[in-house]
């Protein structure tokens, strides 16, 4: 039987529409704040409030799904995101936007956990990899479409918010025609997340997820601001962001194949080294588009390879707790990255964005170059 059943396809359709909305706002929110002459550190704090919401949403998602089920929790999360989006029209104020983006971050994290969990519950041991691969491709595709739309439609606040809100409401419709059961055949006691974070064999993978969060959080939150300060229009910024994310889509398959064939450790070393090269190329004012392309190829594929490394020695019963620990690690990184980087950019120079990215990547590369604990196999079953 095909892994892509009717409910799965409907769920992925809803995710695509929702992700387009996320991508549009993640790019335009920093630009709107910049146009209002807010200082860089405040723009970074608004980005960080979104990632703080991601962290809170990750922590409450399990109980939320348990209480409401997949379908109702999905619809409630969409409504929360739509309300947080419409709230941006009330006033362009630092404190109010801090709150609205926090709520939007909670809604996004809930949607991610709901969709991932529903896909895992729908799949089997033989097709879960296909389902999660489709999930990542849909997510990145929605991100690219959202960036490309910025070159077609008006980017004014009062023009964007109504159709983005309508798109989120439309994303609720597919799950009206699909039902996902959240009851398991036999309940087992939940496994704590904290022991997963302390597991020695998973340390490099967990650190990789943190670094990935710092990298992607900074790029999503501050690269639009960096490009805007370079004199680019909103449409040009959207095009550069689309290039960045598209390179991540292109890099997914070859990086996964390399990791399967040559081992996670070697691929992680290559990815981190390429991130450093891309950052240095941008700082050296070399061709921006090729530099962003190689940065996206390496940076956007770092998280799944690090996640596979961390899950390598986790038993089947521990996978949910380990995945939760990894998502928390990523979220903490994506929270810390824009906060620290925006303060440095405000104090010194916009170039600190790529200096910070190259710096944290170099630290992780030093960890990877140390001899790791012996592994029975360099490959991980995904």
Swiss-Prot record:
Family recorded in the similarity comment? Belongs to the major facilitator superfamily. YcaD (TC 2.A.1.26) family.
One annotated Gene Ontology cellular component of this protein: plasma membrane
Entries under NCBIfam families matching the protein? PRK03633.1
- Name listed for the protein in its UniProt record: Uncharacterized MFS-type transporter YPK_2680
Keyword Phosphoprotein listed:
no
**Topological category with respect to the lipid bilayer:** Multi-pass membrane protein
Localization, per the record, is: Cell inner membrane
A Pfam family of the record is MFS_1
Spell out the InterPro entries in the cross-references.
MFS (IPR011701), MFS_dom (IPR020846), MFS_trans_sf (IPR036259), MFS_YcaD (IPR023745), MFS_YcaD-like (IPR047200)
This protein's major location comes to membrane
Q: Which molecular-function annotation in GO is an example for this chain?
A: transmembrane transporter activity
Which controlled-vocabulary keywords does the entry list?
A: Cell inner membrane, Cell membrane, Membrane, Transmembrane, Transmembrane helix, Transport
Question: Looking at the record's lineage, which domain of life comes first?
Answer: Bacteria
Bilayer-crossing residues are 8-28, 41-61, 73-93, 94-114, 133-153, 157-177, 208-228, 274-294, 325-345, 349-369
Q: Which CDD domains does this one have?
A: MFS_YcaD_like
């Amino acid at each position: 039987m095909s892994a892509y059943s009717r409910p799965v396809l409907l769920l992925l359709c809803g995710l695509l529409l929702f992700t387009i909305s996320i991508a549009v706002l993640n790019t335009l929110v920093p630009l709107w704040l910049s146009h209002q002459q807010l200082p860089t550190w405040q723009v970074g704090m608004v980005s960080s409030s979104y990632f703080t919401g991601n962290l809170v949403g990750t922590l409450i998602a399990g109980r939320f799904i348990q209480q409401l089920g997949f379908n109702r929790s999905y619809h409630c999360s969409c409504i929360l995101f739509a309300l947080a989006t419409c709230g941006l029209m009330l006033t362009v104020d630092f404190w109010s936007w801090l709150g609205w983006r926090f709520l939007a971050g909670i809604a996004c994290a809930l949607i991610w956990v709901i969709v991932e969990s529903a896909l895992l519950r729908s799949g089997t041991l033989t097709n879960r990899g296909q389902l999660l691969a489709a999930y990542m491709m849909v997510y990145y595709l929605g991100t690219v479409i959202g960036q490309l739309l910025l070159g077609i439609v008006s980017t004014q606040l009062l023009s964007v918010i109504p159709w983005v809100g309508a798109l989120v409401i439309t994303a609720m419709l597919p799950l009206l025609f699909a039902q996902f059961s959240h009851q398991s055949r036999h309940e087992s006691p939940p496994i704590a997340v904290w022991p997963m974070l302390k597991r020695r064999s998973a340390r490099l993978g967990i650190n990789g997820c943190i670094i990935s969060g710092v990298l992607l959080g900074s790029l999503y939150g501050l690269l639009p601001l960096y490009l805007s300060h370079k004199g680019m229009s909103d449409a040009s910024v959207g095009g550069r962001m689309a290039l960045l994310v598209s390179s991540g889509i292109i890099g997914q398959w070859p990086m996964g194949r390399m990791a399967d064939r040559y081992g996670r450790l070697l691929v992680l070393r290559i990815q981190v080294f390429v991130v450093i090269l891309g950052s240095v190329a941008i700082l050296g004012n070399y061709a921006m588009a090729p530099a962003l392309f190689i940065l996206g190829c390496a940076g956007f594929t770092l998280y799944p390879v690090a996640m596979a490394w961390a899950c390598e020695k986790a038993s089947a019963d521990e996978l949910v707790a380990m995945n939760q620990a990894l998502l928390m690690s990523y979220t903490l990184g994506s929270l810390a990255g824009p906060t620290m980087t925006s303060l440095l950019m405000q104090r010194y120079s916009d170039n600190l964005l790529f200096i910070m990215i190259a710096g944290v990547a170099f630290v992780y590369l030093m960890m990877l170059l140390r001899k790791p604990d012996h592994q029975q196999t360099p490959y991980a079953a995904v």
